[in-house]
Amino acid sequence: MRVILAPMQGVLDPFVRELLTEVNDYDLCITEFVRVVDQLLPEKVFYRLCPELKNQGFTSSGTPVRVQLLGQHPKCLAENAIRAIDLGSHGIDLNCGCPSKTVNGSNGGAALLKQPELIYRATQALRRAVPSEFPVSVKVRLGWDDISQAFEIADAVEQGGATEITVHGRTKADGYRADRINWKKISEVRERLSIPVIANGEIWHWQDGQDCLSQTGCQDLMVGRGALNIPNLSHVLKSNAEKMPWYEIQKILQKYANVENEYDSGFYHVARIKQWLRYLNKEYNEANQVFDKIKTCQTAEDLKLRLNEK
């Protein structure tokens, strides 16, 4: 079984990827999306969103990283895919699942679910552009506002030449509602396709992973929010390990606060650690106490001081 760290825009940034892969055995990470509009992006854009490219596409602990592209123009997607591969990306992932209103309003992400033909053309363009030894993957949801086109969407991905597909078990309209998860439909998609299907959605603990594998018939899982709730989730899912103790999480947070970020405006780590603590609070009561301690922080220096307080 592979466990893949999902792309989460504005959450699973390079620094979080670095920290999570240090304490796990993730098989692959997907980056936050690189937005492609109508031109070939400069190298610095790829390096900013995927600094691992400067390390041959690996995190410092050796986990391969795959660049995700978001866009609607097949030709431009293909041109930027070639650049990402040349810089060291371990394949290319196409975003057809982001539910953000801003992204969808520009006809990107989940908006493509309404246009299976465009998914096909985009996937085909990527496959033709990317050398055959590099995988092309596509991340989708089950549909836009219902699951009636789930098979058509999946067929478009496979017929476009994708190596594998990740299926999030909800529609765009479902958002992240727990009661809307549909692993059964993922199973039906898997039975229909000949390429590997990676299951995604509502995988928080070891038992969730076992249930998802059983109900979908998939061999691989992708996790996002759960990886923030339990920082060693990959170990938990693969070997039923105990969740990481809080004192180890404190060390991770302190390390994150001390990472130098050349793109930081001064408030970056403050906002991100507050955000992470909200996820951790779902599994650790101590997260609330730490949040209360840092909630008035406005600078990185103040944050470091308070996190180091006993």
From Swiss-Prot:
GO terms, molecular function: flavin adenine dinucleotide binding; FMN binding; tRNA binding; tRNA-dihydrouridine16 synthase activity
Entry keyword Metal-binding: no
Keywords per UniProt: Flavoprotein, FMN, NADP, Oxidoreductase, RNA-binding, tRNA processing, tRNA-binding
Species of origin: Haemophilus influenzae (strain ATCC 51907 / DSM 11121 / KW20 / Rd)
This enzyme's EC code(s): 1.3.1.-
Cofactor(s) required for function per UniProt: FMN
Functional description taken from the UniProt entry: Catalyzes the synthesis of 5,6-dihydrouridine (D), a modified base found in the D-loop of most tRNAs, via the reduction of the C5-C6 double bond in target uridines. Specifically modifies U16 in tRNAs.
Active-site residues, Swiss-Prot/TrEMBL: C98
Protein name per its UniProtKB record: tRNA-dihydrouridine(16) synthase
Residues annotated as binding FMN: P7, M8, Q9, Q68, K139, N200, G201, E202, G224, R225
Class of this enzyme: oxidoreductase
PANTHER family tied to this protein: TRNA-DIHYDROURIDINE SYNTHASE, TRNA-DIHYDROURIDINE(16) SYNTHASE
Gene3D superfamilies referenced in this protein's UniProt entry, alphabetically: Aldolase class I (3.20.20.70), Dihydrouridine synthase, C-terminal recognition domain (1.20.225.30)
Catalytic reaction list: 5,6-dihydrouridine(16) in tRNA + NADP(+) = uridine(16) in tRNA + NADPH + H(+); 5,6-dihydrouridine(16) in tRNA + NAD(+) = uridine(16) in tRNA + NADH + H(+)
Protein family according to the UniProt entry: Belongs to the Dus family. DusC subfamily.
InterPro entries cross-referenced by the UniProt entry: Aldolase_TIM, DUS-like_FMN-bd, DUS_fam, DusC, DusC_C, tRNA_hU_synthase_CS
Site (Interacts with tRNA): R35, N95, Y176, R272, K274, Y279, K295
